[in-house]
Amino acid sequence: MENLMKLRMLSFALTAAAVVCACSVRQGRAQAPTLVLAVAEIHYVDTSGEVIDQSADHRRRLREFEAALRSDLVASGKIANAALECSPNACSVGDIHDGQLLDKAKEAGATHLLIGRFHKMSTLIQQAKFDVIDVKARKVVFDRYISFRGDNDAAWRRAESFLARQILDHGEW
């Protein structure tokens, strides 16, 4: 009888400890800081030499790429969005200096800033460089070079999805 009582007390103590630990873990997760990312407009350079002027299509695809990237990252629940205060088509690394973009990101409440550059090299090949910069430390914490074939909406969507997965899988900020 005495052993049974000790066993019940031990069982109760272990259950209470498990509940306390589980609550602590949940609180720790809830308090984890959310990455607040400002996505600057992406700079675009076309040196393909194509006869047809596709600049309007490229601007449209860039804005769609940026919007989809923001949406995919926010939908993950891991990243919040901060909007940069800039005039339209004047907020990329081709328009203003990185330092100015970082200042705008800080003003917007961002912890991190994503900057990017696309380069269309030929009718079929495009490459891009993306950096995520820690706003406070002013240090690159993520960088990717990507290349893709095609200059149509589907190719751009695949590139955006790939980049979003790369950012979300990075893990260390």
Residue ranges and their predicted role:
Residues 11-22:
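Bacterial N-terminal signal peptides
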Residues 75-115:
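Short, solvent-exposed, polar/charged sequence segments at loop or secondary-structure edges
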Residues 55-87:
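N-terminal, post-signal-peptide region of Sec/Tat-exported proteins
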